[in-house]
């Protein structure tokens, strides 16, 4: 039960998602509010990615934390090919956090996202239309902290930043 003034933390796993959504992060996490019987039905609707965004009008998380210590880059949402980006993504803007999360999945080699600029994805586009968060890279800032001093982390973040700049609608 959601109560007024309640703080909500959205804590999704980082994963690819076969079918319409292509990835499942905080915006898709809100779909958990829908009754399980109705969630199954939505998987057979061509506008699934767009419909899922409308459930996000029910609530606004105070914080989004995506566990990217591991992520699925193929298959999903229940199993798939694993990678270990070893990142945690946190923020108060679920669109911005999902754009970064999807960019990490893409950087890890996901064929589902390989040729698909994140900002042009239907799920992100609908979230922007609904005013759920950042409308483009100018509305977000990526701050990083590498606890290990890893060259792999630096290369990953460089790639993620590049991907977050692609495919921004005019």
Language model: regions and residue ranges:
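Extended, low-polarity segments enriched in aliphatic/aromatic residues
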Residues: 1-170
């Amino acid at each position: 039960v959601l109560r007024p003034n309640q703080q909500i933390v959205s804590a999704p796993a980082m994963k690819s998602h076969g079918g319409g959504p292509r990835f499942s992060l905080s915006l898709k996490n809100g779909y958990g509010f829908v009754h399980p019987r109705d969630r199954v039905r939505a998987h057979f609707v061509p506008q699934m990615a767009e419909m899922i965004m409308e459930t996000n009008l029910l609530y606004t998380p105070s914080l989004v934390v995506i566990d990217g210590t591991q992520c699925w880059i193929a298959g999903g949402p229940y199993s798939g090919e694993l990678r270990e980006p070893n990142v945690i993504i946190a923020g108060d803007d679920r669109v911005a956090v999902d754009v970064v999360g999807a960019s990490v999945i893409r950087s890890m080699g996901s064929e589902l996202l390989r040729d698909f600029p994140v900002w042009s994805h239907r799920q992100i586009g609908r979230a922007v239309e609904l005013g759920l968060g950042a409308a483009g890279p100018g509305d977000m800032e990526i701050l990083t902290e590498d606890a290990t001093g890893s060259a792999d982390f630096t290369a990953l973040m460089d790639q993620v930043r590049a991907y977050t700049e692609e495919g921004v609608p005019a």
